[in-house]
């Protein structure tokens, strides 16, 4: 049996996908796409190691602690080099997680030809007339390169150490004089690059699971500046002490969103000892936090927010706060509920020393079927 490790590339920014969610975090059933693709390919062979490149190791490790994770680089080649530093096997199979339907027949065809060259590469032929710079070119000379590709580990490392400008393994190895062997590819191994590509593949729909998160924050009165709640000015000079602008409602809501998505807390995302957040606009922080939540495959179902304050009175501001939060999160105000209460003069809130906010949000998986 061949000594092979598997590398799955999953650190891309999905810039061409043009959707709120990064494609590797689209949910297929309950699994993120990267995990679905990795489990599919890893089921074909007892790989020595399974290494996944990642932009957020701590988050992805929660899904599959048995895998090895490595930080992605600025380019595909740099990510691959990082992953290769963890590989000890004679051969390495490299694939993109965006190719989710790789078949066992394709895999077997690659493995069976392992001794033919330094890199075994699946390709598709071009059937349509092909034009380059207004000139027709011989389509029989064109090959569409796919993954997975099987390489001798030492050869691939050597190739990428000499140049990191290549977008696939075979061209990197060929550039240093290595031999390439092409095998017939598979239409099902199509890479998801644009959102339209999803519609051509028979993939499981995202599950209907709901994820709840809670947030709580409290700030003390004491700054001679406006009191902001949900980005709405509630009082001219009853400002709250804070590293940022003191919007305690926005802070609690950020924590609830991050909690529901399993992405940590506000202190990790926006540290209060980081000067870039000094006097920061908390609604901008909220917007950035929700963008992150969307990137990881979630969208808002609803938010329920309780403002706990003895003073000032909140009744006349609740609607404006709900509308402003909805605008920031690019949703409709019916999904944002604002409540206000006092502590009946008990505790620090009752003594009018500060304001507390309790939030609860529900998230669901982004429905990529509607793209």
From Swiss-Prot:
Site (Transition state stabilizer): 16, 23, 243, 342
Keyword S-adenosyl-L-methionine recorded: no
Catalytic activity: 2-C-methyl-D-erythritol 4-phosphate + CTP + H(+) = 4-CDP-2-C-methyl-D-erythritol + diphosphate; 4-CDP-2-C-methyl-D-erythritol 2-phosphate = 2-C-methyl-D-erythritol 2,4-cyclic diphosphate + CMP
Pathway: Isoprenoid biosynthesis; isopentenyl diphosphate biosynthesis via DXP pathway; isopentenyl diphosphate from 1-deoxy-D-xylulose 5-phosphate: step 2/6; Isoprenoid biosynthesis; isopentenyl diphosphate biosynthesis via DXP pathway; isopentenyl diphosphate from 1-deoxy-D-xylulose 5-phosphate: step 4/6
Family of the protein in this entry: In the N-terminal section; belongs to the IspD/TarI cytidylyltransferase family. IspD subfamily. In the C-terminal section; belongs to the IspF family.
NCBIfam families per the UniProt record, alphabetical: ispD, ispF, PRK09382.1
Protein known as: Bifunctional enzyme IspD/IspF
């Amino acid at each position: 049996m061949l000594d092979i490790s598997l590398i799955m590339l999953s650190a891309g920014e999905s810039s061409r996908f043009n959707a709120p969610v990064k494609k590797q975090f689209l949910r297929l059933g309950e699994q993120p796409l990267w995990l679905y693709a990795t489990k599919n390919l890893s089921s074909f062979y007892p790989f020595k190691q399974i290494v996944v490149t990642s932009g957020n190791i701590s988050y992805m490790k929660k899904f599959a602690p048995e895998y090895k994770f490595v930080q992605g680089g600025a380019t595909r080649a740099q990510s691959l080099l990082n992953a290769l530093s963890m590989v000890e096997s004679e051969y390495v199979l490299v694939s993109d997680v965006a190719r989710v339907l790789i078949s066992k027949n394709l895999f077997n065809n690659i493995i069976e030809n392992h001794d033919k060259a330094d890199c075994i590469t699946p390709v598709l032929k071009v059937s349509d007339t092909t034009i380059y710079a207004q000139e027709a070119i011989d389509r029989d000379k064109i090959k569409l390169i796919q993954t997975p590709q099987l390489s001798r580990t030492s050869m691939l490392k050597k190739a990428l150490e000499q140049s990191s400008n290549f977008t696939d393994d075979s061209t990197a190895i060929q550039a240093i004089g290595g031999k390439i062997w092409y095998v017939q590819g598979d239409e099902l191994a199509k890479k998801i690059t644009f959102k339209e590509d999803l519609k051509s593949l028979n993939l499981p729909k995202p599950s209907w699971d709901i994820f709840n998160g809670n947030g709580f924050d409290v700030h003390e009165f004491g700054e001679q500046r406006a009191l902001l709640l949900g980005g709405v000015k509630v009082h001219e000079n009853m400002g709250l002490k804070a590293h940022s602008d003191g919007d305690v409602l926005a802070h609690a809501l950020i924590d609830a969103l991050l909690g529901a998505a399993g992405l940590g807390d506000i202190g990790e995302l926006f540290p209060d000892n980081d000067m870039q957040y000094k006097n920061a606009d908390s609604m901008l922080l909220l917007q950035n936090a929700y963008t992150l939540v969307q990137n990881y495959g979630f969208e808002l179902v609803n938010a329920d927010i309780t403002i706990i304050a003895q003073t000032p009175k909140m009744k006349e501001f609740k609607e404006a706060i709900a509308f402003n939060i909805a605008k920031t999160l690019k949703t409709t105000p019916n999904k944002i509920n604002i409540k206000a209460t006092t502590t009946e003069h008990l505790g620090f809130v009752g003594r009018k020393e500060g304001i507390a906010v309790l939030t609860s949000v529900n998230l669901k998986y982004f429905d990529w079927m509607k793209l």
